[in-house]
Amino acid sequence: MIVDRYYYHQLNKKEQAIYKAFYNGVMAYQEIIPIPVSGEFTHNSFEHIFMALTRDNPLIYFLNQSACSIAHDIFGHIAICPQYFFSKEKIKEYSRKIEKVVNELAGKLHLLECSDYEKELRVHDWICQNVAYDYEGTDKDKVSRVIASHNILGVFAYHKAQCEGIAKAVKVLLNAVDVKCIVVTGTAGKDGNMGPHAWNIVNIDGEPYHLDATWDISLPESMRITYDYFNLTDDLMNLEHNPENVLPKCNKGSANYFIKNRCDFQTRYTLLKYIQAQIEHGKKELLFLSLIHISEPTRLRRI
């Protein structure tokens, strides 16, 4: 397992000190966490550090951001007063169960016996085959459902989550087998209909790539695994995704699923030749990347 804290390293020294104190405090389930800062500490600063902490550490799934507060005393001391979704005993119980599930998956998928690319592929495929998108995960009348859906509990306990929970689970699984992975937040959408979204940047053979497992999840009845958003470059990803933070540049394409499997095509001749050969071999469904005579790449064509 690796400790992979990308957002911590984007903070200044003062923010990093607060991040560390906050992390140590919540891992000890403290109700009042003194922080090493004097002077002004705004709610915006707190939110910035909170987001860095929870994206770097998806195993901190039990914090209620909207209910956390900042306390000041007459001597100028400042403390964070966190609110936890669950009791200390429940958090320990859930954390043990999550650790067990992650370890069992690492063994079942043989994640310690393969390349980083193969680890990512197997985690992606497991998510796509075993996790459904939770369309009720924003229903305010179902508070426990919302809590689970937006963190790793949704994936590991209920096999149903929204994009944030899925992206965090991907990071937990990949970090557990020594693959660097970032949770990315921003907006995404098609045809101009943008909304909040979360996905990942995964480091494969020293190069970062975008991975959106949520958008690769098919409808339950199709039972397909798709690879539309498996290891994309910035140019491809930014057609429909807008990250809100400064991120590593994703400029290499060699670990893209279609390029890796030699089913990416830039001429009509090579594409038609590929289709003909696959049909002759009895294939009824083809997945490929086409970059032919179009201004915006078409990631997937099914035949």
Question: What residue ranges belong to the model's regions?
Answer:
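Linear, non-domain "peripheral" regions
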Residues: 1-104, 299
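Short glycine-rich, basic-tinged beta-strand/loop micro-motifs
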Residues: 25-39, 276-291
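Secondary-structure boundary elements
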Residues: 87-155
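Conserved structured core elements
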Residues: 117, 146, 160-164, 168, ...
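Gram-positive cell-envelope targeting signals
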Residues: 123, 158, 163-165, 169, ...
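Hydrophobic/aromatic-rich core segments of domains that either
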Residues: 165-235
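Charged, amphipathic alpha-helical linkers/stalks
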Residues: 241-275, 279
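Single conserved hydrophobic/aromatic residue that forms the stacking wall/gate
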Residues: 292-303
